[in-house]
């Protein structure tokens, strides 16, 4: 299987093949539904890319590529669009 780096200008539907790493910082292997090509998407490979800001609730069926504590970088699987959004509010509280 030939795996290419995820291209910045990719647009199309994707399927997840596999993921490695920890939640919030994973390397994803993706397959284009249209062409069958495989791509690798890692947090380090998209550093510095200009990413549009989106509302979190407007993008279902997305995967989290990176989470730095403030922002989430996610990929919408239906379109192949990478975007940045605010981290979701958490309701977890630590007991003291």
Swiss-Prot record:
InterPro entries for this protein:
DUF5440 (IPR020497)
- Output the Pfam families linked to this UniProt entry: DUF5440 (PF17509)
**Keywords associated with the record:** Plasmid
Out of the domains of life, which is the source? Bacteria
Descriptive protein name: Protein TraA
This chain's source organism reads: Escherichia coli
